[in-house]
C-alpha cells in the first residue's frame, strides 16, 4: 500500500477516480472515532462522498494488527447487502484494491449515531425490531447460496479483529473464565452458516430525525456463525443498561423487539437458542472490559459492574439475558 488517505489526498483521489467530474472545489474532513480505518468525508458542488482506508495497525492502546485487504471484503458485503436490503447500507461508488480505499455515498449530515443517542438518553426502542428484521433478512438470504459462501470464505479478518483481541485476550486476562469463553470461541470457529456482519451494533448505525436508519462498517464480514451478530448487538445494549440503569426498561423493550424482528425474517433457530445467545453476549461484554478494545462509554464503576454481570451470565446462561436485572 503506497497511498495514504488524509484530508489532503482525499480530493485528489476523487478526481483520479472520476468522482469530481466538474472539478468543483472540495472540502475534506476526517471523521473521528475510527479505530480500524481512516475515514474522510468529502463535499462540494455535486460531490458528497465518504472515503475509507483500512489500517494495518489499529488505533488502540494495545498492539493490534490486521490485514488491510479486508476493505475488499467490505466492498463485496456492501454490494451484496445493498441488493438484499436496498437503502440500508451506503452505496459503493468506487474502489481501489491496490491501496485498499473505498468510496461510498455520504449519509445525511443530520443522521445521528444510534449508540451516541442512547448515551444521551434517547433509546429509540422501536428501532430494535427494524435492526432485528434487517439482520434476519441478511442471515436468511445468505444461508443457502454457495456463491456467497465461496466469496466470503475468509476467516482471517474475523480472527484478527474479533477472536484474537476479544475472546483470546479475555481468556488470558480472566483465566477463571477461560473455559467458558474458549467454548464460545470454538463454536464461532466451527459453524459456518451464513454471511455474518461481525460489527452489527448501534455504534455502526445512523438514525435520521425522520426515523430512517442505516448500517455501516462491514469489514469483518465472513461466512460464519450467526449467533455472533446477535450477541454483538445485544452486548452493546446490555452494556448500556449497566452504564445507564434508568434506561434499562427501554433497552429491554429494544431487545425484545430486536429478537422478535430477527425471528420474523430469519426463521426459527438459525442463530441457536436463548442459552447460546446469552453465553455469547456475555463473552462480548467481557471483551469490552478486558479485551483489546474496551468500550469508551463505560466509566470505572460501570466497567466493574459489567464484569460481574457478564461473569454471572456466562456461568448460568440458561437464566437468560436479564437475569441480573
Report each predicted region and the residues it spans:
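Active-site catalytic-loop/activation-segment of kinase and kinase-like phosphoryl-transfer enzymes
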Residues: 1-8, 105, 137-187
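Active-site acidic catalytic loop and adjacent metal/ATP-binding pocket
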Residues: 28-51, 183-228
Amino acid at each position: 500500500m503506497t497511498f495514504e488517505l488524509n484530508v489532503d489526498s482525499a480530493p485528489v483521489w476523487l478526481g483520479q477516480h472520476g468522482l469530481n467530474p466538474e472539478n468543483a472545489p472540495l472540502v475534506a474532513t476526517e471523521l473521528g472515532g475510527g479505530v480500524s480505518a481512516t475515514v474522510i468525508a468529502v463535499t462540494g458542488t455535486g460531490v458528497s462522498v465518504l472515503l475509507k482506508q483500512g489500517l494495518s495497525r489499529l488505533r488502540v492502546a494495545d498492539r493490534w494488527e490486521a490485514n488491510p485487504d479486508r476493505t475488499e471484503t467490505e466492498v463485496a458485503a456492501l454490494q451484496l447487502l445493498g441488493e438484499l436490503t436496498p437503502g440500508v447500507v451506503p452505496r459503493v461508488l468506487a474502489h481501489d484494491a491496490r491501496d485498499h480505499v473505498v468510496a461510498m455515498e455520504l449519509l445525511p449530515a443530520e443522521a445521528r449515531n444510534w449508540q451516541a443517542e442512547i448515551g444521551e438518553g434517547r433509546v429509540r426502542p422501536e428501532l430494535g425490531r427494524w435492526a432485528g428484521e434487517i439482520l434476519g433478512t441478511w442471515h436468511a438470504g445468505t444461508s443457502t447460496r454457495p456463491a456467497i459462501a465461496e466469496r466470503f470464505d475468509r476467516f482471517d479478518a474475523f480472527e484478527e479483529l474479533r477472536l484474537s483481541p476479544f475472546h483470546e485476550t479475555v481468556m488470558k486476562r480472566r483465566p477463571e473464565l477461560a473455559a467458558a469463553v474458549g467454548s464460545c470461541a470454538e463454536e464461532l470457529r466451527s459453524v459456518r452458516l451464513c454471511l455474518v456482519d461481525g460489527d452489527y451494533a448501534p455504534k455502526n448505525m445512523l438514525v435520521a430525525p425522520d426515523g430512517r436508519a442505516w448500517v455501516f462498517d462491514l469489514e469483518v464480514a465472513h461466512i460464519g456463525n450467526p449467533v455472533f451478530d446477535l450477541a454483538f448487538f445485544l452486548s452493546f445494549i446490555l452494556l448500556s443498561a449497566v452504564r445507564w440503569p434508568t434506561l434499562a426498561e427501554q433497552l429491554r423493550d429494544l431487545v425484545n423487539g430486536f429478537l422478535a424482528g430477527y425471528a420474523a425474517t430469519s426463521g426459527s433457530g438459525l442463530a441457536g437458542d436463548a442459552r447460546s445467545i446469552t453465553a455469547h453476549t456475555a463473552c462480548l461484554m467481557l471483551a469490552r472490559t478486558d479485551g483489546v478494545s474496551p468500550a469508551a462509554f463505560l466509566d470505572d464503576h460501570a466497567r466493574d459492574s459489567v464484569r460481574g454481570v457478564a461473569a454471572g451470565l456466562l456461568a448460568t446462561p440458561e437464566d437468560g439475558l436479564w437475569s441480573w436485572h
